[in-house]
Regions:
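Substrate-binding/active-site clefts of carbohydrate-active enzymes
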Residues: 145-166, 170-178, 183-334, 347-362, ...
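C-terminal beta-strand-rich structural cap/linker in extracellular carbohydrate-active enzymes
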Residues: 40, 82-86, 650-669
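The feature marks proteins involved in alpha-glucan
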Residues: 20-35, 67-158
Length: 669
């Protein structure tokens, strides 16, 4: 019995080792033949590949039995299969494999195309915008539909191509952001791509019906989802393309988007969701190698650390290799400049470090960050997971700071509870965020809201933010917790002018804290337009009427956009705000004594070789103006009373500075 167990263990390890000598090249095309390879159990009764004419519907043109050779199931089909579609079938339902690079509508079948024909003109000359340090990044998180669906002059509303249009590029460049974090843009399962465009539906339905049968016309309601429902990880989402039926279209248009942003000096960061799949039964992982890619609990149930019904097992050799190859593929094929790992706390540390190491070998400037938490208990030791507390073991990888987020606006658990902006004593938590979650002698860790000890080795390992797609946007949160707590159904547009002015003051103050902190600044798209979602806490499948950006706000509240723009410029022009090194932060950043509700700090002695010798930032959340003692000197104010001007607004002399209620003061000498 012992010999049998050892033999089976040896065979299993040999299978994985042999399979790992291959990349996930499940389909290799040439005009003479096409070769298929699949990682699937050696003891599978039957593994087949089916060839189809269409991406959806119709019977298979060919069905070929695959043979098990050297740890993989393989088959070769002679002849030119360009333009055909294929699926794998091992008795659990057909699927396009786990590493399809092109698919038909809804991702049910993989497509055989020539990838070189999906490159836009001059693609070979496309280059990543220069980024010397993650501290130099200004990350702008956006959803394709949110950004462009309500823009009157947009030609490609809700599509990849919207980000190639001049209005979009001009807005982003003027604002000053230099990295776009796009919400999931791989092929996901929660939007039916056949019901996006009634004309396309009619055209393709007509082609698939018997001669003489005319399909009924159909009008489709708009569909919306954030896309955290992975199906095909390595193919762009079809609903963001102009034709989801044509496999090459989504690929070409995604590349055109990247190319346009790169020409504008803007990096592209992909939101990747390797921690779970849309479901288990229908997933490509499960249909090719049942239960291998998922974690299970001690009692045999599927673990649910993602909160979505399952969690993948990144520590298993082939899941780890899948993640490594997928990241590399997006970098090589689509020129992606960074990756945001959804629920990074579900992934093991070793896999994350191997990804960082691999990426460094290609381009060390590619930025990696993620959520340093999970959404439930993972079936893996917490000390080995990519949690925020373990960031010191993952150098070169950053995590979101819920400390600074919740210090500013209030706890995630209750939208009606305020934070520092609403008068709560969270000064130490805010200080912890300002230094970038590193060890600093003036931060009293016992008073920090969540972290028991510093979790970042370098400040560039902390994402500084006050809002993102999750939870309420900043305007809604301020409405619910500070401005109009007594009437939770009211909306920003219904406020009187006095309350609107107060909300705007707090909004600008919050972002000043974010953009003058030493972490990597991150903002939700539309915050520069006073975006609101009508109070919706979780808008993942809410309609466009909730999620769209209201572009008319740019004209209604020009002072808000101007402040955001000038705040970003201030950070970009002055290295003191982005030192990028923990020792430099401890050397040059000193907190000043300040009254309750105020946080003040001094960036001293030409920090980061800044042109300004001393910079003092005073953040006042209280409803009264406050006095703060400062080093005696002659100062120029560049931020005061909701206005920023680097050339100077006024001068101050002496050893005291007065900052207006609910505002920031930035001065220098």
């Amino acid at each position: 019995m012992k010999k049998l167990v050892l033999f089976l263990l040896f065979m299993t390890m040999t299978t994985f080792a042999t399979a790992q000598n291959f990349r996930f090249d499940e389909m290799t095309y040439s005009p003479e033949k096409t070769t298929f390879k699949l990682f699937a159990p050696a003891d599978a009764k039957s593994v087949k590949v089916r060839i189809y004419k269409e991406g959806l519907g119709g019977k298979a043109l060919k069905t070929i039995k695959m043979q098990y050779v050297d740890g993989l199931w393989t088959a070769t089909v002679k002849g030119d299969l360009l333009g055909r579609f294929y699926t794998f079938d091992m008795g659990h339902g057909e699927c396009p494999g786990v590493f399809a690079k092109a698919v038909g509508v809804n991702g049910k079948r993989a497509a055989i195309i020539a990838m070189t024909q999906t490159n836009p003109e001059e693609w070979e000359n496309d280059q990543r915008p220069i980024c010397k340090s993650p501290a130099d990044l200004v990350v702008y998180e956006m959803h394709h539909r949110d950004f462009s669906i309500a823009r009157e002059d947009a030609q490609y509303k809700g599509k990849f191509l919207a980000l190639t249009e001049s209005w979009a590029i001009d807005h982003l460049k003027t604002l000053g952001v230099n990295a776009i974090h796009i919400l999931p843009s791989y092929d996901y399962g929660s939007v039916d791509e056949t019901r996006i465009d009634s004309d396309l539906y009619y055209e393709h339905a007509y082609e698939s019906l018997p001669e003489g049968v005319i399909p009924a016309r159909a009008d489709f309601s708009p569909q919306y989802n954030w896309g955290y429902d992975p199906v095909n990880y390595n193919v762009p989402e079809g609903s963001y393309s102009t034709d989801p039926y044509e496999p090459a279209t989504r690929i070409l248009e995604f590349k055109q988007m990247v190319q346009a942003l790169h020409k504008a000096g803007i990096r592209v960061i992909l939101d990747v969701v390797y921690n779970h799949t849309y479901d288990i039964e229908h997933s490509n992982f499960q249909r090719t190698y049942p239960d291998y890619y998922y974690r299970k609990t001690a009692d045999g149930a599927y673990s649910n650390g993602s909160g979505c019904g399952n969690e993948t097992a990144s520590e298993k050799p082939m899941m780890r290799q899948f993640m490594l190859e997928s990241v590399k593929y997006w970098m090589d094929e689509y020129h992606i400049d960074g990756f945001r790992f959804d629920l990074m706390g579900c992934h093991d540390i070793e896999t994350m470090n191997q990804i960082r190491q691999m990426v460094d070998g290609i381009d060390p400037s590619v930025f990696i960050y993620g959520e340093g938490w999970s959404a439930g208990q993972c079936a893996y030791p917490s000390e080995q997971l990519g949690l925020k507390a373990n960031i010191p073991q993952m150098l070169g990888i950053a995590a979101f700071s819920d400390e600074i987020r919740d210090a500013l606006r209030g706890p995630f658990s209750d939208d009606t509870k305020p934070g520092w902006l609403g008068g709560v004593n969270e000064e130490e938590s805010l200080k912890f965020g300002i230094v970038g979650a590193i060890r600093h002698p003036q931060v009293k860790m016992k008073k920090v809201n969540y972290a028991e000890k510093p979790w970042a080795v370098e400040p560039t390992q902390m994402m500084s933010y006050v809002s993102c797609h999750d939870d309420m946007c900043l305007v809604d949160r301020l409405m619910a917790s500070v401005i109009d707590k007594s009437n939770h159904n009211s909306q920003f547009s219904t406020l009187n002018s006095q309350l609107k002015e107060e909300l705007i003051r707090l909004d600008l103050l919050a972002q000043t804290a974010v953009f003058t902190s030493q972490g990597v600044p991150f903002m939700l798209s539309g915050e520069e337009l006073l975006r609101d979602k009508k109070g919706v806490h979780n808008s993942f499948e809410s309609p466009d009427s909730i999620n769209h950006l209201d572009w008319t706000n740019k004209e209604k509240y020009p002072q808000v956009f101007e402040y955001y723009k000038n705040l970003i410029d201030l950070r970009k022009h002055h290295p003191a705000f982005r030192l990028g090194n923990a020792d430099l932060v401890r050397k040059h950043l000193e907190f000043l004594q300040a009254p309750k509700g105020v946080v003040a700090f001094h960036l001293k002695n030409y920090a980061g070789r800044d042109d300004w010798r001393n910079i003092i930032v005073i953040l006042n959340a209280s409803k009264q103006s406050q006095q703060v003692n400062i080093p005696n000197g002659n100062y120029i104010a560049v931020c005061r009373d909701g206005v920023i001007n680097e050339k100077g607004l006024c001068t101050l002399e002496g050893n005291q500075a007065e900052v207006s209620a609910q505002s920031a003061l930035i001065i220098h000498d």
